UniProtKB/Swiss-Prot annotation:
Pathway: Lipid metabolism; fatty acid beta-oxidation
GO molecular function: 3-hydroxyacyl-CoA dehydrogenase activity; identical protein binding; NAD+ binding
Residues annotated as binding NAD(+): 34-39, 57, 122, 127, 149, 173, 305
Functional description taken from the UniProt entry: Mitochondrial fatty acid beta-oxidation enzyme that catalyzes the third step of the beta-oxidation cycle for medium and short-chain 3-hydroxy fatty acyl-CoAs (C4 to C10). Plays a role in the control of insulin secretion by inhibiting the activation of glutamate dehydrogenase 1 (GLUD1), an enzyme that has an important role in regulating amino acid-induced insulin secretion. Plays a role in the maintenance of normal spermatogenesis through the reduction of fatty acid accumulation in the testes.
Family label: Belongs to the 3-hydroxyacyl-CoA dehydrogenase family.
GO cellular component: mitochondrial matrix; mitochondrion; nucleoplasm
Positions with a binding annotation for CoA: 73, 80, 149
Modification type N6-acetyllysine: residues: 81, 87, 125, 136, 179, 185, 192, 202, 212, 241, 312
Protein's name in the database: Hydroxyacyl-coenzyme A dehydrogenase, mitochondrial
Species annotation: Sus scrofa
Top EC class of this enzyme: oxidoreductase
Subcellular location per the Swiss-Prot or TrEMBL entry: Mitochondrion matrix
Length: 314
């Protein structure tokens, strides 16, 4: 009798999970974990397009800083969007801000959300532990998504019991301005989950593209090897960094040269990505670390944010 009861419970649980994954979700309520630049940007665009948002971080001070940054960003948007009607711009800012609440307790706010978007530190263990904990409190239908740019989505999904309702949702910086969103599907991501995230991205005014869970997805898989190859040209003495930048801007039509872009993104960020890929596939020639970049990072010369990278900034 006890065995039969356990089997029935398992069957009902399995049926419930299958039903949740088979159903397309209209995302109205969004929980964003991480109040940094990316998380705040995601919260801003979600709230500005009619979604109810809860922004979560570790302390009230961080959240206050995040909301202040969101307000400043919104006022810039309003100034341009409502140039002829400042009053309407003020109303837009206030309405958007009123749609964003904050919390320092993620577990207490995910029970009724439709979508959880994680945008915290790029650390597999930290992210996995977060998702494992939230999985116990989130509703059955809730979709989990990570904004990671370098970690494997499948590894994060495996920390939960909702692998079919788990995907990558990779925004680009600055989120309010950049139109692209990469929707990353693992082998377990259901078609309905994928469709739900594509639809959600469109409601944000973004252009979603879908891809498999491979290193770098689409943009970084093409961009990072290009940047590293530019550094190798420089390391070999084939050309100066200034001439390489000029060549790519004037010859390829790129708005920034590779060294300018590396300094803008952050050499520490690029090193983190390439090191992670190298760890996954050390034989891939595209994933080989750069001695010149490693040296700069070791000297805490990360680019524009530290005042010096490949170039010096005043």
């Amino acid at each position: 009798m006890a065995f039969a009861t356990r089997q029935l419970v398992r069957s009902l649980s399995s049926s419930s999970t299958a039903a949740a994954s088979a159903k397309k979700i209209l995302v109205k309520h969004v929980t964003v974990i991480g109040g940094g630049l990316m998380g705040a940007g995601i919260a801003q665009v979600a709230a500005a397009t009619g979604h109810t948002v809860v922004l979560v971080d570790q302390t009230e001070d961080i959240l206050a800083k995040s909301k202040k940054g969101i307000e400043e960003s919104l006022r810039k948007v309003a100034k341009k969007k409502f140039a002829e009607n400042p009053k309407a711009g003020d109303e837009f800012v206030e309405k958007t801000l009123s749609s964003i609440s904050t919390s320092t307790d993620a577990a207490s706010v995910v029970h009724s959300t439709d979508l959880v978007v994680e945008a915290i530190v790029e650390n597999l263990k930290v992210k996995s532990e977060l998702f494992k904990r939230l999985d116990k409190f989130a509703a059955e239908h809730t979709i989990f998504a990570s904004n990671t740019s370098s970690l494997q989505i499948t590894s994060l999904a495996n920390a939960t019991t909702r692998q079919d309702r788990f995907a990558g949702l990779h925004f680009f910086n600055p989120v309010p301005l950049m139109k692209l969103v990469e929707v990353v599907k693992t082998p377990m991501t259901s078609q309905k989950t994928l469709e739900s995230l594509v639809d959600f991205s469109k409601t944000l005014g973004k252009h979603p593209v879908s891809c498999k869970d491979t290193p770098g997805f689409i943009v970084n898989r093409l961009l990072v090897p290009y940047l590293i190859e530019a550094v190798r040209l420089y390391e070999r003495g084939d050309a100066s960094k200034e001439d390489i930048d000029t060549a790519m801007k004037l010859g390829a039509g790129y708005p920034m040269g590779p060294f300018e872009l590396l300094d803008y993104v952050g050499l520490d960020t690029t090193k983190f990505i390439i090191d992670g890929w190298h760890e996954m596939d050390s034989q891939n020639p595209l994933f080989q670390p750069s001695p010149a970049m490693n040296k700069l990072v070791a000297e805490n010369k990360f680019g524009k944010k530290t005042g010096e990278g490949f170039y010096k900034y005043k």
